[in-house]
Amino acid sequence: VNDAILHAIFADGCAAAVISGEKPGSQKAKGKFGIVDTHGWLMEGTEDGITLSINENGISCILSKYLPQYIAKNMGGYVESFLGMHNLQKSDMDFWAIHPGGRRIIEEAQNGLGLSEEQAKYSWNVLSNYGNMLSPSVMFVLELILNDHKKALAKGERGLKQGLAFSFSPGVGAEGVLIKVM
């Protein structure tokens, strides 16, 4: 039954990224994302939140009904700690790429981080138009963000400077990427 529910709530999607060693400020890097830092964090006491196992039918995933609460409770501290390593605060972020793992996942990430609906609009857009595609979902969010940045620049407006992308892994883990727009 669990696998049938999971197949019903997950969508299909594919994403790829080209990562290069272009120097910030170079013409090739302009208008693209630069990875400043990455950080993985395991939320204490959430081992039942997302569990994966391999069986004769393939990969099986079990999601705890408490997963959204784990995210709400833990994301604020995780993000503050990660940004603090770079002398940054949430208010310094121009964009947020929240893994669109479902309505409750986005809502509770917003609640835990004190973000508005507007700040999570890209994640809501991807969830609404594509659903939760698991791993590639946050890449779709980043594509929307980069497209909006390029549109703003084309109109002579200030583009985006920096933001944070994150998704969730078994454990429950949070995997974050601090991004600068070149």
Go through the PLM ranges and name each one.
Residues 1-73, 77-81, 168, 177-182:
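Condensing-enzyme catalytic core mediating Claisen C-C bond formation in acyl metabolism
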Residues 50, 54-58, 63, 84, ...:
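Amphipathic, alpha-helical segments enriched in basic
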Residues 72, 76, 90, 94-182:
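Claisen-condensing/thiolase-fold acyl-transfer catalytic domains that form or cleave C-C bonds
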Residues 83, 88-91:
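Long hydrophobic segments that form regular secondary structure
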